[in-house]
Amino acid sequence: MAASAIFLMDSKGKVLISRNYRGDVPMSVASKFISKILEEEDLNLKPIIQEDGISYIYVKHNNLFLLATTERNANAATILLFLYKMIEVFNEYFKELEEESIRDNFVVIYELMDEMMDFGYPQSTEPKILQEYITQEGYKLERGARGMVLPAAITGAVSWRKEGIKYNKNEVFLDVVESINLLVSANGTVLRSEIVGAVKMKSKLSGMPELRLGLNDKILFENSAKTGAPKGKGVELEDVKFHQCVRLSKFENDRTISFIPPDGEFELMSYRLNTTVKPLIWVECISDTHAHSRVEYMVKAKSQFKGKSIANNVEIIVPVPPDADTPKFRCTVGTCKYAPEKDAIIWTIKQFPGGGREFLMRAHFGLPSISDEKPATKPPIMVKFEIPYYTVSGIQVRYLKIIEKSGYQALPWVRYVCLSGDYQFRTS
C-alpha cells in the first residue's frame, strides 16, 4: 500500500490542507475528483473512484472530504482505514474535525500528517502516542546530550504503549459484553437471531506488562479445525477481530491470546455468533379494537433465562395507534406510561427475575369516532434489558495472567453482561 498524496477538502472541493508524499501523482488531480463527485448523486457514490490510471480513495466527514490518491496497485481497504484513523486522531486533538478546526490548527495538522505517514506508508496512528510529542502549541521534542530523542514508543515495536507508565495500584478490568439481535414473527417463530460480542479492557498497569488471556474450552474460533481442535459441542465464534496489540502469530499457532496492552480503555477483541437464540425475555401481545371507539392491550412478558440471574432496567415498548387517547394501565409489576411522541406504551420493570417468571400488563385507550379505514402497518414491540454476570454464548475467562519484569502483583477484575440489541417482536 502506498498513498501518493492526502488532501483535506471542503464540501465544494477547495483544498484546505494537502501533503504530497511521493510526488508521482500531480496535485492538480484533486479538481478532477471533486468534478466526479458533483456529477454523481449521493446514492451512487462509491468510496473509490478510478480515472486515467489514478485511484481516488476518500471518506466524507462533517462536510469535509479526506482524499488519498495513488496510481499504484494499492490496498484500498488499508488506505480507507488510515483515513478513518486520521479522523480519530484529529477528533482527539480538536474535539471535532470540521473546517473551522482545520483553519485554526494548520501547523499541528501538518505535523500530524508527517508523523502518521512516511513516503505514503502509515506510521503511528495512536492518538495517545502522538500527543506525547505533538501538542496544540507545536512540535516538542526532548533534546539530550546526543541530540534529538524521540519517544520510545515511536522507535520501538510497541507503538500503542509508551514506556515509563507507573501506577500506585496495578489493576486491569475486563468486561465481556454481548448484545442479542432478535426478530420474532407474529406467530412466535424466531426469524433472525445473532450475538454480537466484545471483550473490553481498562488497563492501569505499570511498566511494559505482557498479558495472557485464556478462554474456556467451549469456545472455538473460525478455522479451529486446522489446529486439530475438536468441534463437539463447542461454540464457534465468527468475524473475530483483535486489537493490534494481540500477537496474531501466537494465536494462530496455539489459540493463546497474548498481548502488551495499551494504557487505559480499549477493545481487545470483537466477535459475532450466528445461531438460533432462545429469547431471554419472551413477549406476547393481544390487542382488541371495539367498534373503532377503544382499543385494549394485554401484554405478557416471561423470563427464559436462569433463575439465579436478574434482568435490570427492562423496557417493553408497545406501539399504539397515533390517534389513541385517554390511556389507562394496570400491571402486575413495574410502571407504565404513555409516550405520545413515540406512539407507544413503555412498560418499565427495574428487576425482572429469571427462571420463568411471568408478568402481565393491561392497557386501555380511547379512539376517535372517525378513523382511517385503511389499516396501518403495525410497528414491532421493542424490548430493552441488561443481564449482569451472564453471557448467551457461554464464553468465560479461565485465566488472565499478568507478567511484568519487576514482578509486581496486579489485580484482574472480570465482569460479564448481556444486553438487548435490535430485539423485536412482530404483532399480528
From Swiss-Prot:
SUPFAM superfamilies in the record: Second domain of Mu2 adaptin subunit (ap50) of ap2 adaptor, SNARE-like
Domain MHD: 169-426
Record keywords, A-Z: Acetylation, Cytoplasmic vesicle, Golgi apparatus, Membrane, Protein transport, Transport
PANTHER family to which the protein is assigned, alphabetical: AP COMPLEX SUBUNIT MU
CDD domains (UniProt xref): AP-1_Mu1_Cterm, AP1_Mu_N
GO biological process, alphabetically ordered: endosome organization; hypotonic response; intracellular protein transport; lysosomal transport; sorocarp development; vesicle-mediated transport
Family as reported in the entry's similarity comment: Belongs to the adaptor complexes medium subunit family.
Disruption phenotype: Cells are viable but display a severe growth defect and a delayed developmental cycle. In this mutant, phagocytosis drops by 60%, the protein transport between the TGN and lysosomes is probably defective and the contractile vacuole is lost.
Domain of life: Eukaryota
Protein name as it appears in the record: AP-1 complex subunit mu
PROSITE patterns linked: CLAT_ADAPTOR_M_1, CLAT_ADAPTOR_M_2, MHD
Record's function text: Subunit of clathrin-associated adaptor protein complex 1 that plays a role in protein sorting in the trans-Golgi network (TGN) and endosomes. The AP complexes mediate the recruitment of clathrin to membranes and the recognition of sorting signals within the cytosolic tails of transmembrane cargo molecules. Also involved in early steps of phagocytosis and macropinocytosis.
CC annotations in GO: AP-1 adaptor complex; clathrin-coated vesicle
Gene3D superfamilies named among the record's database cross-references: 3.30.450.60, Mu homology domain, subdomain B (2.60.40.1170)
GO molecular function, a single term: clathrin adaptor activity
Species, as recorded: Dictyostelium discoideum (Social amoeba)
Native organism taxonomy: Eukaryota, Amoebozoa, Evosea, Eumycetozoa, Dictyostelia
Compartments, as annotated in UniProt: Golgi apparatus, trans-Golgi network; Cytoplasmic vesicle, Clathrin-coated vesicle membrane
Subunit structure: Adaptor protein complex 1 (AP-1) is a heterotetramer composed of two large adaptins (gamma-type subunit and beta-type subunit), a medium adaptin (mu-type subunit) and a small adaptin (sigma-type subunit).
